[in-house]
Amino acid sequence: GYLGGYAGYAAAPAAYAAAPAAYAAPAYAAPAVVKTAYAAPAIVKAAAPAVDYYSYPKYAFEYGVNDPHTGDVKRQWEERDGDVVRGEYSLLEPDGTTRTVTYTADAHNGFNAVVHRSGPSAHPAPAPAVAVPAVAKYVAAAPAVVKSVGYGGYGYH
């Protein structure tokens, strides 16, 4: 036992209780299984989606640019009637030719474009080679070795 100044630890308890004679685990009951009947979903044929226009799509536009200062030369036109779109645009290529693209688009054929080039192709002559004078090689003298003068007052020699 404990021999210090607290008497509550000086001796063992006067009696011990005996272990229980038998142990019964709690009973477990599995939840009841409820059978649910399922029916196959009914097959419904979907109707083709109806085209619902707020207003019938119909437009036409055309524009062109001819800026000699920047060299920007182009034009375009397009028209739509329902689900059919037709149009054409052209632009001046850097080599001087004109590229023209004619296109159509509809629900049956999709988008189709035909590209044409017209006009003479003008390529600038290559710039003449410029002769660059050779740079003279720089030659430097090797550094001279100089014996150090000691610093006698500071203990360096």
Curated annotation (Swiss-Prot):
Domain Chitin-binding type R&R, chain residue ranges per copy: 56-127
Sequence repeats: 11-14, 18-21, 24-27, 29-32, 39-42, 47-50, 141-144
Alphabetical UniProt keywords: Cuticle, Repeat
Domain observations: The tetrapeptide (A-A-P-[AV]) repeats found throughout the protein are also present in many proteins constituting the protective envelope of other species.
Protein name, entry field: Cuticle protein 19
Listed PANTHER family: CUTICULAR PROTEIN 62BB, ISOFORM A (PTHR12236:SF75), STRUCTURAL CONTITUENT OF CUTICLE (PTHR12236)
InterPro entries xref list: CHIT_BIND_RR_consensus, Insect_cuticle, Insect_Cuticle_Struc_Prot
Functional summary from the UniProt entry: Component of the cuticle of migratory locust which contains more than 100 different structural proteins.
GO CC annotation: extracellular matrix; extracellular space
PROSITE patterns named in the record: CHIT_BIND_RR_1, CHIT_BIND_RR_2
Higher taxonomy: Eukaryota, Metazoa, Ecdysozoa, Arthropoda, Hexapoda
GO MF term (any one): structural constituent of cuticle
Pfam families tied to this protein: Chitin_bind_4
